[in-house]
């Protein structure tokens, strides 16, 4: 018997969507794409070791690269996990990959992202809009969506964010100006509620215990 393959909902041409899999609903005899809107919210991916967190980040990177141009989307990658993501350093969309031993490079990336947020706030104010989507819908194409992917948030926080918290302002202000964060981690504990409150999108892979993903 044929199973219906549901058509995707109509999407705004200003938004960045990526397909990460298929949802199977046997009781409805229905299959549909599982897609993430990377323009409207930050995403937190939680899962135990070997649960597929890095694979999911790679799926997102490839999905963006296959469906959007570098003029539409720029990627920045912070890999404090398996270091596999540095294989994407030469991707045309990728502005840089930072690993755990790249102290100066990481600081420069934080400065660049902070400067970009301030620049974009000024650009939006110039035409009287308060969101990046409104800026794009006004016909502006000079600014790409920026997506920052972080593998192993706990390690990043422990190694570099104890004295100066570079990330919290970026998490808080990014979405409104076209900067999205996709963060992968073993568990929510140790990240802190002030970080988690900026992630409306939450994806839970296999976890050994419910405490790993409880908020």
For the regions a language model picked out, list residue spans one by one:
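Conserved P-loop NTPase
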Residues: 1, 208-215
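P-loop NTPase catalytic phosphate-binding loop
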Residues: 7-133, 138-211
């Amino acid at each position: 018997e044929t199973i219906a393959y549901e058509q995707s909902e109509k999407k705004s041409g200003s938004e960045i969507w990526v397909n990460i899999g298929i949802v199977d609903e046997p009781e409805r005899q229905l299959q549909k794409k599982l897609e993430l809107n990377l323009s409207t919210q930050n995403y937190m991916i939680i899962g135990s070791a070997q649960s597929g967190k890095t694979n999911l980040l790679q799926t997102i990177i490839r999905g963006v690269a296959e469906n959007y141009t570098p003029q539409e989307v720029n990627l920045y990658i912070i890999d404090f996990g398996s270091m596999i993501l540095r294989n994407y350093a030469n991707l045309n969309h990728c502005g840089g990959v930072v690993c755990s031993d790249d102290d100066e490079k990481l600081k420069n990336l934080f400065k660049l992202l902070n400067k970009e947020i301030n620049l974009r706030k000024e650009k939006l104010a110039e035409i009287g809009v308060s969101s990046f989507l409104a800026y794009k819908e006004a016909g502006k194409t000079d600014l790409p969506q920026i997506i920052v992917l972080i593998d192993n948030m706990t390690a990043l926080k422990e190694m570099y964010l104890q004295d100066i918290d570079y990330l919290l302002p970026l998490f808080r202000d990014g979405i409104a100006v076209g900067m999205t964060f996709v963060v992968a981690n073993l568990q929510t504990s140790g990240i802190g509620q002030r970080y988690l409150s900026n992630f409306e999108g939450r994806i839970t892979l296999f976890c050994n215990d419910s405490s790993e993903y409880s908020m």
